[in-house]
Amino acid sequence: MSTKTSIRGKSKKLTLSILISTVIYLLILLRLTLIEPNWILEIDLSEYSFIKTMGIIIVSVGFILGILALIAMKNSWRVGIKYNQKTALVTSGIYSISRNPYFLSYDILIFGYILIFPSIILMFLYLTLVYVFHKMILEEEKYLQSVHNKHYLKYKKKVNRYLTIKL
């Protein structure tokens, strides 16, 4: 008999972030297939095709960053905080330059989509999502510090929350 271990935590912030992300992707999908741009208060940047090109590049960077984050996490990956599960503290790979590369990848990815499909509604949802992600990160940091104590504090001093640039 196998027992499945859930990878999803439970919190209002997590549920809200999933809801906002879903709405963003549905609006993008609807924009691609069915609706007129004005419905989502789209901003006309047709004169600036380089912005869409930058958006495509940024989406690609966000996608690759997300894949690298998932690969580095291996079996430690969770959606939200699972207080009853202790996983390894991952500090190598992409986690050596960002403590939160998966959240960062989502921020980058959705920002790229907004450059491709500039919309006031999408921008508002994006900023809300970035705020919710930040709150989730702060909550996760407290949890990681309580579970990994000195190891996490050492990691926290060495690697920035979002991006560590070493020159």
Language-model features: locations:
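Membrane-anchoring alpha-helices and their flanking helix-loop junctions
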Residues: 1-88, 109-167
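Active-site-proximal inter-transmembrane loops
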Residues: 82-103
